[in-house]
Amino acid sequence: MSNSNTTQETLEIMKESEKKLVEESVNKNKFISKTPSKEEIEKECEDTSLRQETQRRTSNHGHARKRAKSNSKLKLVRSLAVCEESSTPFADGPLETQDIIQLHISCPSDKEEEKSTKDVSEKEDKDKNKEKIPRKMLSRDSSQEYTDSTGIDLHEFLVNTLKKNPRDRMMLLKLEQEILEFINDNNNQFKKFPQMTSYHRMLLHRVAAYFGMDHNVDQTGKAVIINKTSNTRIPEQRFSEHIKDEKNTEFQQRFILKRDDASMDRDDNQTGQNGYLNDIRLSKEAFSSSSHKRRQIFRGNREGLSRTSSSRQSSTDSELKSLEPRPWSSTDSDGSVRSMRPPVTKASSFSGISILTRGDSIGSSKGGSAGRISRPGMALGAPEVCNQVTSSQSVRGLLPCTAQQQQQQQQQQLPALPPTPQQQPPLNNHMISQADDLSNPFGQMSLSRQGSTEAADPSAALFQTPLISQHPQQTSFIMASTGQPLPTSNYSTSSHAPPTQQVLPPQGYMQPPQQIQVSYYPPGQYPNSNQQYRPLSHPVAYSPQRGQQLPQPSQQPGLQPMMPNQQQAAYQGMIGVQQPQNQGLLSSQRSSMGGQMQGLVVQYTPLPSYQVPVGSDSQNVVQPPFQQPMLVPVSQSVQGGLPAAGVPVYYSMIPPAQQNGTSPSVGFLQPPGSEQYQMPQSPSPCSPPQMPQQYSGVSPSGPGVVVMQLNVPNGPQPPQNPSMVQWSHCKYYSMDQRGQKPGDLYSPDSSPQANTQMSSSPVTSPTQSPAPSPVTSLSSVCTGLSPLPVLTQFPRPGGPAQGDGRYSLLGQPLQYNLSICPPLLHGQSTYTVHQGQSGLKHGNRGKRQALKSASTDLGTADVVLGRVLEVTDLPEGITRTEADKLFTQLAMSGAKIQWLKDAQGLPGGGGGDNSGTAENGRHSDLAALYTIVAVFPSPLAAQNASLRLNNSVSRFKLRMAKKNYDLRILERASSQ
């Protein structure tokens, strides 16, 4: 309230003072005729200041603080006190008065009343001046003093506008011309301009004020009306004169600027060139640094890709660093989880058994015990027991197998099998041999195993391969050996859970260091003439372990036994556990027979994985008098050659009497396409002259051939009882087989002889063996793991008296225990026959032909390991044209039907050679006169078609080919 009262009082006082000043000024103008001097003006200013002091004192009354607070409100008083007519265009007062006025306007004061009084005094002085100056119309007075009502200097504004903006210049010139015409027209006192924009109206207002006219807007507010007044004048200078001056000035300035620009351009060019060079240098440095960083970042990926493209590529620097002595966990996993690890080639996968996986298979080693890393040739420490780990994280090193560890399954939650109290203790110290860089021509490494002297710590050694999650090209190896007696681990028989803990049988005596040499041969450099292989001749029966039974699932997730009359126990060897997202390789429970076991597991994604344990009885070891190696072509066990990424595997066994430090070897053969490999076999003292055996059927994309040469350990036992050599293997497929239904499994053959007693055809004839050939005993045959079909029976099985799978290893009986999956040895059932070498193949088989059993046809439950299947069980009397209509399902599977004219005129006759002519013509003759062969694009497609058609109500069946067919001839015939 006090502020408002003070404001009202101040306004009233100001109004009264203004009235008095106006009256005084009017009186003075009436009676004073002379121009006031400077002294009078100064006196008036002093009087005005005194009045202001008195007014301020009367208005304050001790309310300085209140008025200080109300200064923001009192600022409105200025606009009220200032009158628009106060600044008349003809005010040519003294300079001192104008300076005083400008001072009061420019300098803000806390006392608004002082400003108002100054304005009033200014008005009074101007009125006096106007009285003295004679009034003239259209005066030529100087326009430098013209200001707008808002205090803007019109002359300066107009000159600047004329110089700066060409558009406004044209507008101002136009307005000037119209206003001059209006001034010269005495008939009209006002002029109305058309409607225009607000900016142009502002220009018109200022030009009219500059000419001393009244300027207002009409009712619409968009048109300006100007009126002539007594103060109307014509400026001394026209607008065009300012423009001419500006043009001249601009021309001179331009000329000067041109010279300056030229000199500056030279400097700029010099500095620009230097700057350009500097920019180039900096860009090069930045590019080189960024390239160096990118090389450092992506060096690992490029090296991984180089290892993928060539199996002969050496290990990376990080892998070489693992050769330094340090714990195993630091060797195989560096703690950092990588989203992608480069795949391992077959040559570098032996490096410390440290397997790198791709995709989700992230290698991690959690071995808690202290270990040692040794160069090639150093021995392994105490054995260990390891189990396979999860599907997404695979083991690159060793894992301690405690009593609480169980197998983790992905997607298919298979019930885990609890370990027995006889489960092995944690890891002991061990050494893993790392291989140096395997050069392109040759590289080798040694995997050594040394028995432990601690009898109180019985354990088995298993270097676990990782789960293969995505890539089918990955290959891994397992070197397994035992050196101590192991108590029998009794597993309760279960029909639903697969074995999750794997234990290899121990030894009853201390084992000398065993070495396996791994050799790599690039394409075309395999020394065929230097590698000599001999067959095994002495078989021995290998009975299954009594108290050791492995669970066999009857449901989809497990392995299904195919022989009801066989004991569901002692499935010795390997169990391939196939999961939808990864491929795990599990070693099953081996029987604790107290024999020396040394195994090598070679894992191929599209091919079977084989475990080749070589064991000698702990109480009976025969010292051989001479060296008699054995070559087992694993590729021959695969019917019809190899899949796209398959690798033929050859096993060679050398007795310890002839072995030296590097005698055992595992070699890789890089096949150039489907070339044949001559594997000469050196004649032994107990065998007839060698006969060359040819192995082919390797697909062009096959990465290589593996030749493994194993040493048979020595032992202190007498030679009465022969040692036991067991060959067991497992077949499992890659991820591409996930689509197969779990129920599409083979049923066992009706022939008990084919189920219980089957032997495979070896490389050479068992007649070369100097020892007797007892009946080979097979423990059981498995069907496979769902959702992937695993094959049940084997191609070209033999009868109980033919002895094809019985060989002698230095006088030691040998029996091939085909415990779980397809057999390891059947050389004659492979599609290796070339057109010009059929006689040689049949010459080799002719020696075994007399010993063959009549039960050589397994019927519709044949194991499908190749691409070629024979079509059987067609309806009687059906013609070739009608039969072609039945093969639509085969055509949908990608199969190509070939009609081969049988030599004897009988369908499916085995006596004909493999060079039958493929006839693609359509004839009305009977289909029984032909051997109908279906060539599938892959063994997987053949397997799926066989499972689908043999288990359905189709009018024909598919079986494995009873003789060897040249795939190239069949494909060439189908393409014609």
UniProtKB/Swiss-Prot annotation:
GO terms for molecular function: RNA binding. Residues 682-691 have a biased composition (Pro residues). Keywords: Nucleus, Phosphoprotein. Residues 58-71 have a biased composition (Basic residues). Residues 441-453, 480-504, 748-758 have a biased composition (Polar residues). Transmembrane segments: none annotated. Residues 36-56, 109-143, 257-269 have a biased composition (Basic and acidic residues). Residues 32-71, 105-147, 257-376, 401-457, 480-560, 661-725, 738-780 are annotated as: Disordered. Pfam families: R3H (PF01424). Residues 306-317, 401-415, 543-560, 692-714, 759-777 have a biased composition (Low complexity). The modification Phosphothreonine is found at T856, T860. Coiled coil: none annotated. The modification Phosphoserine is found at S37, S143, S330, S333, S349, S853, S855. Residues 169-232 form the R3H domain. Residues 233-310 form the SUZ domain. It is found in: Nucleus. GO terms for cellular component: nucleus. The keyword Cytoplasm does not apply. This is R3H domain-containing protein 2. The gene is R3HDM2.
